[in-house]
Curated annotation (Swiss-Prot):
Cited InterPro entries: Beta-RFA-P_synthase, GHMP_kinase_N_dom, RFAP_synthase, Ribosomal_Su5_D2-typ_SF, Ribsml_uS5_D2-typ_fold_subgr
pH dependence: Optimum pH is 4.9.
Cofactor(s) the protein needs: Mg(2+)
EC nos: 2.4.2.54
Pathway: Cofactor biosynthesis; 5,6,7,8-tetrahydromethanopterin biosynthesis
Catalytic function, reaction form: 5-phospho-alpha-D-ribose 1-diphosphate + 4-hydroxybenzoate + H(+) = 4-(beta-D-ribofuranosyl)phenol 5'-phosphate + CO2 + diphosphate; 4-aminobenzoate + 5-phospho-alpha-D-ribose 1-diphosphate + H(+) = 4-(beta-D-ribofuranosyl)aminobenzene 5'-phosphate + CO2 + diphosphate
This protein's UniProt keywords: Glycosyltransferase, Magnesium, Transferase
Stated name of the protein: Beta-ribofuranosylphenol 5'-phosphate synthase
Similarity field: Belongs to the beta-RFA-P synthase family.
Amino acid sequence: MIIQTPSRIHMGLIDLNGSIGRVDGGIGLALEEPNIKIEGKESDDISIEFDKKLIEKYGEDYIKSVRDRVYNTAIKVLDVIGGEGVDLKILSLFPAHSGLGSGTQLSLAVGKLISKIYNKEMNAYNIAKITGRGGTSGIGIGAFEYGGFLIDGGHSFGKGKDKEDFRPSSASKGVKPAPIIFRHDFDWETILIIPKGEHVYGKKEVDIFKKYCPVPLNEVEKICHLVLMKMMPAVVEKNLDDFGEVINKLQYLGFKKVELSLQSDIVKDLINELHKDVYAGLSSFGPTIYAFGDKKLIVEKANDIFDKYGVYGEIIITKANNVGHKIW
């Protein structure tokens, strides 16, 4: 049995002010590529194998970290469903801490595959609770389960509520995944640009939330206005210019403004250059940039910036995944 999951771009957290009694609220999009693909079958114990090309591409350190995550997820899920073991082979991956949601997709893929193998199927929300994913944004879980363009409703906020302070998903164990409140198929081609930039995670990520939150309420109100009255209608009415204009404006509002300010010069330079002619944003903390518009122009601009800084960067031309994970 094989499972394939999408990646996702995270376009922003709507409310990290919290004065209304809710926080977070994510905006995102599931993508066909890059993806995670895992093959599995029932076994007496747990074994984890990797396609040789992945070891060559990502190196031993990253492969070890993936192996550890896969093993820990498998242990938790097998314990819940009463299974003995599983043989897993990782066929495709994408980098961690790059803004594409690899941690959530990997955990959900392993959990879902094991539950299917043992005919004790669980949905993504059950698996997320077991594995501790989705504590800030529900976009990764929604991308896995449904695909498409997604907005989640965040969490209740305050003493005795879902969340009592500002923190990222990685530090939000035990918090239930945010509900998906809007989902729609997405038709436009998406270009990913992955330059050499800052990778934000762990304690550094927690400290950023502590330092920069709450964000100003007036900026949260602007984000809500743009998302509800321009971005969502643009997706439904297939108006790329309206959608893209919101993407460009979101880079300089709320917590996204913080995320972009902490990125390297090449990332900031790339976004500034792209904004002259097309639509582009930083996915999560980055360094991945997503862009919409003239594909040829986007690729040319990205390569020009790579040349300017003398660095290698990856460009992926992809499209939305409108169905979520696939199993065969």
